[in-house]
Every structure is written in structure tokens, then in C-alpha cells.
Amino acid sequence: IEAEGKEVLGTNCRRFRDFPILTKFIDAKQDLSIQVHPDNRYALKNEGQYGKTEMWYVVDAGKEAFLYYGFKKEVSKEEFARRIQEDTLLEVLNAVPVQKGDVLFIESGTIHAIGKDILIAEIQQNSNVTYRVYDYGRVGKDGKKRDLHIEKAIAVTNRVPLIKSRSSYPHVADCDYFTVDKLNLDGRMMCRVEGTVSEESFVSILILDGEGVVSCGNKVSYQKGDSLFLPAGSGAYVIEGSCDALITTIRAKAAPVRIGIDIGGTDTKIGLVDVHNKLLDSVCIPTKAERPADEVIRTVAETALSILDKNGIAMEQC
């Protein structure tokens, strides 16, 4: 690292100011505070650092374990503030029962918390910006209640219900900040896996359970709880043994918007979707297929450009 500096991160990481991710284990013996993280735009403007999107992988959980993830129903800013003041916020939070192996992708702006009796492996943006919303009235070692950040939390929180988990198939999680894959070596039928560390990204290996050896130039033994870093451009590597692990890389940044066009004999549909496959806008126009092909294509192109212009999106963003 001293010799190569940021080059060990790979070309896909050049867009980041700092090391892009943090990996950690969180062993919750009691209910943790209700909190939310801002997105990059808000955090950079107000805190001088990046926001935080994260992923939780449930390593272990008790029989009645749950996580708070978003709201049960849409709430206004006024209701949000009132419920915090009246200690009734938990009544409108979405409690999600979890068990070992479950995954939640927590996008910035999502109110969330870890319940008691859960061991979490967390992959997150490298940021320390957290707005604490509710802390069960607990006090710190100094005898005082911990600070809450209610005004900022209300400003950044998505106050509508969320789908439990958007699909990142074939990955465990996939976004502009990290891509996470799950590895399972049972030590019998599957006891070895090979991969390549490209020039584009480092490889981070977080061992959830088991033991074995990782070979990448030299051999390193691993056991439960270990975290291994393979620098970008390291070439071929081999993981051997019996383990469960999360493997994290950084992909190229996705285009923020994609255009979908469905040309039918009667109608042509044009839609815009974001990187999470959320529909931003759409339009349906008559195809008029009896016209020359170049006229049909010209009409489709002009309509696509008009829908981009309507949404303030440049072609370079697609």
C-alpha cells in the first residue's frame, strides 16, 4: 500500500476520494438505536463527507429476531416529528423478522435499526454520517441521553413504505458503491474456488464461518471473522477449505438512466428506468407501421429525446 497507494484499489475506485467501503460485524445484544443516513449530495453539503448506503447479511439470529426497515405506511414530516416527540415512532416502523442468511439492502434515506440477538455482517460506504432518530430513552456513561439528530433525519428520510429487498441477482447486493457475492465451500463436494483480481477492482473477502487457505502469490490461512484484502491486479487467486464468506468488489459506475423501447405493430412504448429498475417516466405512441422504417425510427428517436428533455436528463446520462 505504501508503494502503490490508491492503485491497489483499482481503476473503478478512482471516482472515490477515500477507501470506498467499510466491512464490519455487529453483534447486537440489545435493540440498537433507530437511525438514518443521508445520501451523498446532502452529506457532502452538510457534513463534508459522503453519505451511506449499506448492506446487512444476517450471520446469526435468535428465534424472535427482527430488524426495523422503513415505515409500515407513508408518514408526513409532521407526523414523523410528532411520533419522535411522543415516543410512538416504533408503531409506524416496519419490523422485519429475520433468520440466518437473510439480506437487507439499506439505501441512504432508509430509516432502520438492528434488533437484539442478531449478528450482522455489514458492507457499507466508507462514511461515518449517522442521524440518530430514537434511542429508547437510554443514557450514556455520563448519565445523559445520547444526542438525537431529528431535524436532519426528517430532512433526509424516505417516508414511504419500502419493498423488503430489491433483487440484485446473481449478486447478494449490487450498487455503485459495492458488489457483494456469497461464497459457500462445504469442504466436501465444493472445497475450492478460483477467481481473478483484475486491474479494475480489489477483492475483499469477509469470512463468516469456517477455515482454510487463500492463495494469491502467497498462502494465507483464514478462520471465522477474518477479513482479507487482495489488491487490484493481483491476478489469479484460490480459496480452499470449508467456509461461508462475502466477497466484495467495486464495479464501474452504472449509467444513472436507461431507455427501454418496445416497438409493436400498433403501439410503441418508451420508458425511463433508474439503476434500481424504478420506472421514472413512460409514454405510449401509435407506431403507424405502414410508414417507411426510417420515419418510424425518427419518430421513436424524437419521442425518446422529448421524454429525456421533460425529465431534465441528458443523453450522456443514459
Kindly label every feature range from the protein language model:
Residues 1-100, 110, 114-211, 215-216, ...:
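Active-site region of the double-stranded beta-helix
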Residues 103:
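Glycine-rich, mobile lid/loop segments that gate access to catalytic sites or pores
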Residues 187, 232, 241:
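Residues on the solvent-exposed faces and adjacent turns
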Residues 211-213, 234-236, 267:
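Structural motif
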Residues 224-237:
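Low-complexity, intrinsically disordered Gly/Pro/Thr-rich segments
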Residues 257-298, 302, 306-309:
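Short glycine-rich, Thr/Ser-proximal phosphate-binding strand/loop in the N-terminal lobe
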Residues 309-318:
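Short beta-strand-loop/turn "lid" adjacent to the catalytic site in phosphate-handling enzymes
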